[in-house]
């Protein structure tokens, strides 16, 4: 669903913020993030939030090292400072540049493949078995990354993993 997203990325202490004269930091970012959740803030994973805000600036710079360009920072209330960076020209840039780099360094990306079982040797994942256009296939590799879209359009999964109230909210991307 990355290609359907806005492609925005919130971060502090970025070249964009410095150029705009914005003094900001991870602690302020951390404090602002719970404002999005409002009454559900108690459900937030504070350890993951801390990891995100402490690494967002470095991650944005890493993305830029692959040629990803950002516009901003833009205001994004309830954040008190502008820290939303929007990818240019759109979110497909992530797929094009990062996917291209992955292919260049030898990553074998499988599309339209339904992963059904990890192949393991002891406690180590050594591959994946699943169904693709060619039927049932096994892939073995030194590293296995399982990636998928989201479940924003699945009322059943949203109800199971979030809440019944959220399950009734229409998806931004109905085919997700």
Model regions and ranges:
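Glycine-rich loop(s) and the adjacent beta-strand/alpha-helix scaffold that form part
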Residues: 132, 139-176
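Hydrophobic/aromatic ligand-binding patch that stacks against planar heteroaromatic rings
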Residues: 1-2, 144
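Conserved N-terminal/central alpha/beta ligand/cofactor-binding core
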Residues: 3-108, 112-117, 156-165
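Conserved beta-strand-loop-beta-strand element in the redox core of flavoprotein oxidoreductases
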Residues: 117-138, 144
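Gly/Ser/Thr-rich helix-start
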Residues: 1, 8, 128, 150-151
